[in-house]
Amino acid sequence: DEILPQLEGSVDVLAGNSSGGIAAFYSNTNVLKIKVKLSFKFHMGHMPYTGQAGFDLYIGNTYHDMKFYRTSNFDFNKTEYEFTYFNHANMNEENKLFVLNFPLYATVEEVLIGINPNSDISPCLDLFKNEDKIVFYGTSITQGGCASRPGMSYTQILSRMLGIECLNYGFSG
């Protein structure tokens, strides 16, 4: 907070964007929902709303073998939304790894994850193969500019391919 007043106005705002953020957990749920609160609405005409303020979901057994499942859809005129990724009564209830990629251009104030109340959930503490990290610093392309959804920014693609945490310090403009 001490440094923010010294930054140019746009960097101050962009520093709150959640590009590169993830929530990773194991669960045997057959229901997955999110409830999201964003700081403000987004209307960037050159980029899909799903990339700007959507969350996308990957499911698998390990981070390296994850498959894209779905991206949240929402009313882009609102700062709060709820989205159900799935609600399958007959879904195989074995433990799976779930990774939610956070929006590329939104400042997320709150995200709540809802699962079946009879299901187990635990944080994924072993997501990456090693403790090393790759730090990316750059402009809008690094932040994820114009990607159709959060998991398609190049830093997230590399993170999945290499199994390593990528820290995204991309700032548009």
Residues of each region from the PLM?
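Conserved SGNH/GDSL esterase-like catalytic core that processes O-acyl groups on lipids
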Residues: 92-96, 103-112, 127-173
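N-terminal secretory targeting modules
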Residues: 1-133
